[in-house]
Amino acid sequence: MDQKLSKLVEELTTSGEPRLNPEKMKELKKICKSSEEQLSRAYRLLIAQLTQEHAEIRLSAFQIVEELFVRSHQFRMLVVSNFQEFLELTLGTDPAQPLPPPREAAQRLRQATTRAVEGWNEKFGEAYKKLALGYHFLRHNKKVDFQDTNARSLAERKREEEKQKHLDKIYQERASQAEREMQEMSGEIESCLTEVESCFRLLVPFDFDPNPETESLGMASGMSDALRSSCAGQVGPCRSGTPDPRDGEQPCCSRDLPASAGHPRAGGGAQPSQTATGDPSDEDEDSDLEEFVRSHGLGSHKYTLDVELCSEGLKVQENEDNLALIHAARDTLKLIRNKFLPAVCSWIQRFTRVGTHGGCLKRAIDLKAELELVLRKYKELDIEPEGGERRRTEALGDAEEDEDDEDFVEVPEKEGYEPHIPDHLRPEYGLEAAPEKDTVVRCLRTRTRMDEEVSDPTSAAAQLRQLRDHLPPPSSASPSRALPEPQEAQKLAAERARAPVVPYGVDLHYWGQELPTAGKIVKSDSQHRFWKPSEVEEEVVNADISEMLRSRHITFAGKFEPVQHWCRAPRPDGRLCERQDRLKCPFHGKIVPRDDEGRPLDPEDRAREQRRQLQKQERPEWQDPELMRDVEAATGQDLGSSRYSGKGRGKKRRYPSLTNLKAQADTARARIGRKVFAKAAVRRVVAAMNRMDQKKHEKFSNQFNYALN
């Protein structure tokens, strides 16, 4: 009974499941009901499992405790008698002993313990004084918030509050820094916006100011807005007689028309009092308005006109007149896109994260809207040409060349003049055939250069010519140097083809020469930097060096012999292996002589083959270790693949269902750590450091100032 109880507790607590197995839990309850001794033993086993450094084991053990606590008075007495230790193991009330990993299971354990203790106090708090005191201790001393869904302790809440305060402080500092940056850069941004707006107004003389009612880029003209306002019969102050300075830059179709309330064809509405008075200035304005409307063919204010501008017509064509403006606009827009707009977006993000600096946030949002509006204008105007600066430069250069060419006067060519006479017509003109131009020029250059070198007495050509003058004239060819017969020539060619060819080396350089200084080394007895002995230094002859200058090492790998045999081991499909390896087949091992059916000819090889077949028959094909490992990884069950592993079993986990705490998370830091701190990498680093120390020791070991380090 005791062994069965221990086995049930171990299986339930090490299952790793979020819920307990109902059948095993039913058996455990049945054993605990049998006697108080078994109940006490179950309590001790559960407390032992609660001390394990694994949160999943503690969670399962607490679930068993919760099931038994509400059903047995004796079990409640055992738990309440050691209630403080129970809370430390399940709730983590001791900051020095936090709950073990994994973190998710520890969080579930803390939440379950908080709910259970609160429920136990409501049901059994009056009957068990220690339980009520423990609940009071948790609420008032440990400051456990039972309404908190995360069931955090006081220490955890303090840590999180400190962490949040630290983050708030960092965000506040960043927001203050952003505010200072905005104060410093606002003037620069405003001047940049003013500059690019001025460039746009000079490039395209339309009013591109954003309309407060719409977000268009000024596609609709101001004329339609004025007509709509006059049609609605709105009464407002007219424009003064002084013209707007911007009216001169606008076309006549987009000029704002002053509202005329006294026009007889205008819509209904109250007439202003100024109209009743016979002011001559008002009459002049009315007459000017009527004349302006009639001259443009409008005739009335009771209808509106929508002027649509083609988007293709807004693209700026680059020429010499607007080249400087386009360059300035391009530079400014590049500055906005690469510097100002990212900075403004960063300011908005910092101000939004802090929640304060409302005025700064509003100002940053306005700046962002203005910058984005400018970029949209740039995109619609398409002021950047496709050809780039190189094409513009070439065009300007061609224009300058054309201007320079205009200074010359064109003279007509003479009739019948031939600047070049073809080769086939040269005899008709009484001229000789022209030699190859390139050959003549090349020969002249070579001859001129040789003459110059010979005339220089310090040159090698002059010295060579001097030696040739002193040498006797060459004698006639000897009979031995006569041309050989065809048979001798063939024999000589065959011998030359059979003769080995070796690269040029030191041995050929000193071939047949006596080397008086070969292998001699000057040996000095004193190694001091300043004091030298007065006697003559000795010379030591090294025979190895002399031999190196007269000999050569030639590696003879032998003659290549192709493989003539096959593996001929039987394959699963019934055919024989046709690999031609020299000694060993990578699939069937050492190559041995076999007959036509694949059986080894040597009796020892045949016996070894039979033993291997018997071992293979003992293990079915479905028990392939690789296949079983794949199935185990997919199902989580142990199928015994380690028993068939040929390289050793390895260390088996005791509870494979639990989360492996030793397994590292597959993060970039962990992967880099595995590569950097691998045993082979550490050995390489240690070996390299040892070599560096050895070189330093060999170089400075005899100097006293380095010997102390």
From Swiss-Prot:
Acidic residues composition-biased segments: 280-289, 397-406
Domain of life where this protein originates: Eukaryota
GO molecular function: chromatin-protein adaptor activity; RNA polymerase II complex binding; RNA polymerase inhibitor activity
Species, as recorded: Homo sapiens
Disorder cited: UV-sensitive syndrome 3: An autosomal recessive disorder characterized by cutaneous photosensitivity and slight dyspigmentation, without an increased risk of skin tumors.
Biased composition annotated in UniProt, kind: Low complexity: 477-486
Biased composition (Basic residues): 646-655
Quaternary context: Interacts with the elongating form of RNA polymerase II (RNA pol IIo) during transcription stress. Interacts with the TFIIH complex during transcription stress. Interacts with ERCC6. Interacts with ERCC8. Interacts with USP7.
Pfam families: DUF2043 (PF09740), UVSSA_N (PF20867)
Outcome following mutation: residue 411 to A: Impairs interaction with the TFIIH complex
Name of the protein in question: UV-stimulated scaffold protein A
Ranges of compositional bias, category Basic and acidic residues: 1-10, 386-395, 592-632
PROSITE patterns, A to Z: ZF_UVSSA (PS52058)
GO CC, alphabetical: chromosome; nucleoplasm; nucleus; site of DNA damage
